[in-house]
Amino acid sequence: MVEYDLVRGEDDVAQILDLQRINHRYAVDAATGQSQGYTTVQHDPETLSAMNRRYPSVVARSEGKVVGYCLMMAQEFRDRIPVLMPMFRMLDTLDWREQPLAGNPRWFVMGQVCVAEAYRAMGVFDGMNHHLRESYADRFDMTITEVSSANPRSLRAHRRVGFETMHVYEDPEADEVWEVVIWDWR
């Protein structure tokens, strides 16, 4: 049985980092990445711990072990992960429903979602996202993330729980097209 919870401490952070490493785009072959998805960012332990002290991320547990995670990344951490800094700068230029994101403290970035292979296609992604909403809808109006167009499984999953595409852009340095997706909780 899978239960949804918030990160409780450093052991959870270590288990998140393990799942992240195992499922990173450079750790899985192309066919697996295409069919099962992959993670893009590798967080350093110090930053991930700080993020979870401020706003604990959602985890899925089975028999006490973290089998999935949905990271909560408040805007205040925008400068802590260099690879994400361009994304935050770009988000500052966007509007949602005719309102600028820049200066609006009522949104956060869903930093990454990952489900252990043995728990995929069991509703864990959806369960974690719904727990995220239950946990933070009183403090935030929306969550935003970006998903590589080369990761169709992730795009489908995000759309299924309620994310909508708000912007698409090409990153020439990474030779990748990204979809910026938003889940408006209002």
What are these regions (language model features)?
Residues 46-59, 75-82, 109:
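A short helix-loop-beta-strand connector motif used in the catalytic cores of GNAT acetyltransferases and
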Residues 54-70, 85-86:
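Conserved beta-hairpin
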Residues 126, 149-167:
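Conserved active-site alpha-helix within GNAT-family acetyltransferase domains
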Residues 112-115, 121-135, 160:
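Conserved acetyl-CoA-binding loop-helix of GNAT-fold acetyltransferases
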